[in-house]
Amino acid sequence: DLHLEMLRKLHYSVELGGFGSRHTPAEALACPALQDVRLSPALTGGAAESRRMKILLDGMISDCHKMGLRCLAEGIETKGQHELVLSLGADYAQGNYYAEPMTAAEFEDWSQSCPQICCLE
């Protein structure tokens, strides 16, 4: 935790990746240096098809916000998934729905034409 706190003081963002997968324990959310939580594509993809997964994702986003953490929904592939994570309050989203993987040069061109790169609005 001391090293993570040092990184925060140097203005680095401390994120927990893959949250909601079996490899990321819930107690990792208790780390005081943590700022952002990246929600697993297994959660975001499953929530569009399963009522229980949607309830689980909703609760995770809500609980993260209660702890002062921002949520990034990973693996967004469809408009339905985009609308779902937006309605549940995710702060950010990423996935092929927004853009396919690209080179740095392609990213420069793409970023000039896309006004909402960073936030769900």
PLM features per residue range, with description:
Residues L10-E121:
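EAL-family c-di-GMP phosphodiesterase catalytic domain
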Residues D1-L4, L57:
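Heptad-repeat coiled-coil signal-transmission/dimerization helices
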